[in-house]
Amino acid sequence: RAGLVGSDGETHQGIFDLSYLSLIPNMCVMAPKNKWELSDMLKFAISSDGPIALRYPRGEAYDGLSEHRAKIVYGKSELLYDEECIALIAVGSLVKTAHEVRQNLKRKGFECTLINARFVKPLDEERLLALTKEHKLIVTLEENVLEGGFGEHVSEFYEEIGSDVQVMNIALPDAYIEHGNVEILKKECGIDAETIEKKIIAAAMGL
């Protein structure tokens, strides 16, 4: 269980786990988008060899996007919506937020691909490479600090292959986050749908 936990206290916030787990050799790190995928990932983990960390949020499980339930394949992300120009790649609990952002942007004339990362480690490098063909802006979204997290690894991948695609990382600040209502904390940290939407529009206007 990880991510922002609200009123339990600032030392209970699980915001560094993706960073330190990614450092462990042979470790597989997964994050489900909803309760159905959590069940599927548990079954996948039981039938797999090697260590697997399965990250899920505190609180009631999200039951949206239930129509998207592609088979889990090791190291592969899930394509939820396929469009052009902007690609949103979200981890775990932020898939719900990214879906809301995509719907709002679409109403304003911005087309967005939406990808459920599923795997934080290993990265789906095949998908990341394919995105550069039809997208100018790649946005990563995670409920973890940027340093050592999913977004930083995605940015490093594009830098290593010499891609000129623009990458925006949506993540938590590198700091201890005070206790409080989770939705309020998300807004204060800039990972709520409204704030993310504004950042993407500003970046997209400059493409």
Identify what each model region corresponds to.
Residues 1-47, 199, 205:
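Conserved thiamine diphosphate
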Residues 4-14, 47-207:
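Thiamine diphosphate
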